[in-house]
Amino acid sequence: CSTNTTADGHEVKIIRVAFNQNEEHPQYKAMRELGDKFEEATNGRYKMVIYPNGVLGEQGSMAEFIRTGALDMAIVPCSVPEGYDSDFAIVGAPYLYDDMDHLRRTTLSGAFDELFKSTRKFNFEVLTVYTAGERNIYANKPINTPDDLKGMIVRVNDSTTYLNMVKYMGGVGTAMSQSEVYTALQQGVIDAGENSERVYTDFKHYEVAKYYSYTKHIVHPDVVIASTNFLDSMSAADKEIFDKLVADSTDYEFDAFAESVQEAKKDAEANGAIFVYPDTELFREKCQPLLDSISGQSEVTKKIYDKVQALREEK
């Protein structure tokens, strides 16, 4: 934290937070809620300043800024801590969760706690998961079975896991920048995209890929990371308040994202999109070898996998 002094001489600790989306995004709103509540609960001793829209740089560099003390917190993809500890691959593994609620229950159950604290040796800690929604496939035809994906070129993030996932699902993955997807679909360079309903609608991909099929291959976790210097600088009482508000903000974000998905679907349907609901088990079975490989890479990942499965059965 940096420190400011008010006109009446009180010290205010500034919590600097980086985020790559705009102020309308559910993740921004959840972080704003956390900051406002913490400021109120500490009688103004802490104030959160959020830098949205990626103004402080690429998400991949945020962990380094936090490690050096240039930032206190950030919302980043799970691939960022995975760069420090490969066990984080399990958190965003294909077909690990049934839906966003399953990911929420897993996060709040404490299933990730051991893994999340493991990065303290790198001077940052993962505090919680914020969802970025469920990723599904969209194309100019409905996708009901893995056979429907045969030979189709599907745009994915630049990730070995994503490329392998599409291969197991029956298609051919190709990495491509999000900004290029609309034109690539329009020109037939790719046959399909895969992302959340928000992205599908915000980028107007329904204009070039009418069918949005709920393959539900990824329930997307982003993570909130924080500097250990910032966390350790808090008193025990303030830290207890902060931890409670982090959990509250997790619930807030999942609820807000679910609401935004419904709005995105209505918008897409009004513009001619057709939502398709295949049997996801057909795709899950195809991807099971990939999930087994990721979940079996260490004792930590095995424990997390077992906890996730137990929570599935408790539903």
Model-identified regions with their sequence ranges:
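Hinge/lid segment of periplasmic solute-binding proteins
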Residues: 105-123, 129
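N-terminal secretory/targeting leader peptides
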Residues: 1-100, 120-315
